């Protein structure tokens, strides 16, 4: 029997903005097992990497068939974007309140498709000693620096 996902942490990093970037995800299961993921992009921004981490986390949940989930991000941009700003952007044809095109619309559209009412988006302050957030940050920074970190995958689907 598969254990339920208890919580997920996501983070993104970028060396220069834009510049080489990385993202990290740590999935914690109720049975104590962990699944870590990450990736890199050659020329990107911190916000895009934060969004890519959230997308990877939600795709993992969807593949695992494990809603609901608590998703922690240290990006206010991602948290507010998905929980507050997105409905207005869609109503205005993907324009901001100032009438400008929404940045990262391609990724917002993917996040919008993956997001469900069963996702509980939570903000966690970055670099505050939270173990899940710190581990995601280390994964994201390693990928941004061109290194392949050792990823714990005690639970594979």
Swiss-Prot record:
It holds the Pfam family RNase_H. Keywords: Cytoplasm, Endonuclease, Hydrolase, Magnesium, Metal-binding, Nuclease. PROSITE patterns: RNASE_H_1 (PS50879). Gene3D superfamilies: Ribonuclease H-like superfamily/Ribonuclease H. It is found in: Cytoplasm. InterPro entries: RNase_H (IPR050092), RNaseH-like_sf (IPR012337), RNaseH_domain (IPR002156), RNaseH_sf (IPR036397), RNaseHI (IPR022892). Its cofactor is Mg(2+). Residues 2-145 form the RNase H type-1 domain. Its EC number is 3.1.26.4. It is an enzyme of class 3 (hydrolase). Endonuclease that specifically degrades the RNA of RNA-DNA hybrids. This is Ribonuclease H. It comes from Cyanothece sp. (strain PCC 7425 / ATCC 29141).
